[in-house]
Amino acid sequence: MKYDVALFDLDGTLVDSVYDLYIAINLTLSGLAFPIVSQRLVESWVGNGVEVLVKRALSGDMQVSEHLDESLSGKAILEFYKHYEQQVGEYSVLYQHVETGLAALRGMPKALITNKSRIFTEKLLDKLALTSHFDVIVCGDDM
């Protein structure tokens, strides 16, 4: 079977970026006088974007509390972005064989599709020397 293009997700597919998120979440929570959470909890909460991640952290649960104050969550999301901007790519690592796999696809057009914001995506890709592998990069805030 021949393919014309290879499409990739970023977080959890090419890159293990959970520790960066874990640090940024806990800096956000502690700054708002909320208890910090475990990396395991953060791992279970990722995958639905930053807003949901932050709301889950404020709720302390996978299920966002129906009583969560929108003003508080808005403030927390802004704080998270500030912390994450400092953390993105600091502890992220490529999964095993990613470089080999991308090299094996040299010559084939490759696109990266992620729900991560462009500013964070570009910073992460640059830090991990992945930018040049992709012909097209589509981010969550592009749509």
Where are these regions (language model features)?
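Substrate-recognition element of Asp-dependent hydrolases with the DxDx(T/V) motif
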Residues: G101-L125
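Short alpha-helical
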Residues: D20, G49-V52, T100, I119-F120
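Metal-dependent phosphoesterase signature
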Residues: A57-A103
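Active-site neighborhood of HAD-like aspartate-dependent phosphohydrolases
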Residues: M1-S44, K55
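Substrate-recognition "cap/lid" segment bordering the active-site pocket of phosphatases
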Residues: E90-V93, S117-M143
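Hydrophobic packing residues within well-ordered alpha-helices of enzyme cores
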Residues: I25, V54, V98, T121-L125, ...
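Alpha-helical substrate-recognition element adjacent to the catalytic core
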Residues: L32-M62, E70, H83
